[in-house]
Amino acid sequence: LYPGLTVAILFAAEFFMLAQAIRYTSASHTVVLLYTAPIFVALGLHWKLPSERLSKIQWSGILIAFVGIVTTFIGRENLLEQGLSQVLWGDLLALLAGIMWALTTISLRLSKLNEAHPTQTLFYQLLGGFVFLFPLAFLLGQAEIHWTYIAIGSLVFHTLIMSFMSLMLWFWLLRNYLAS
């Protein structure tokens, strides 16, 4: 139960931070910073699993990735237009969402959930997301839904493709391949 609760909380925290990040910074910043998760997974598992030790070339790759991320954010004029502190807050939230995703992945790899069927892990994450995020939507005044055909289609797509199929594939990959 503890590993399931851990991944549920981390999953909910990731999506909460992601949703908040988009309120303060651009979607492009959010996506780039969210997808730092594999870097943090490689770093985290390097210290926890002997089979995931990073080689010198992999360390070089991580350094290049970090330098690339920093380089893409340097010298952007739109930061001043949007308000630097607001954008930086959103960027921090997006980076924290990436770290939460990485911690979720690391928790999956290090716990008994690594041996569980992917549907069980998916259940923990989606149930946890619902239990923690549903009340937060009301507390933050973000619970109003404007039902349109596009909204319904998007909900169906994200439920079936993004939440089910892609996460099932992700869990299968985690069980069958090293993160590094």
List PLM regions with ranges:
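Hydrophobic/aromatic residues within transmembrane alpha-helices
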Residues: 21, 47-50, 54, 111, ...
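Helix-helix packing/entry segments at the starts of transmembrane helices
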Residues: 30-36, 107-130, 160-180
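Hydrophobic alpha-helical transmembrane segments of multi-pass membrane transport proteins
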Residues: 5-24, 43-44, 71, 92-107, ...
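Membrane-interfacial segments
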Residues: 52-53, 57, 76-83, 109-115, ...
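Short alpha-helical transmembrane interface motifs in multi-pass membrane proteins
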Residues: 2-3, 29, 57-61, 88-93, ...
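Hydrophobic transmembrane alpha-helices of multi-pass small-molecule transport proteins
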Residues: 36, 43-44, 54-77, 133
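Transmembrane alpha-helical segments that form core, pore/gating elements
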Residues: 41-42, 48, 79-140
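Cytoplasmic-side transmembrane-helix entry/capping segments in multi-pass membrane proteins
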Residues: 2-6, 53-67, 115-125
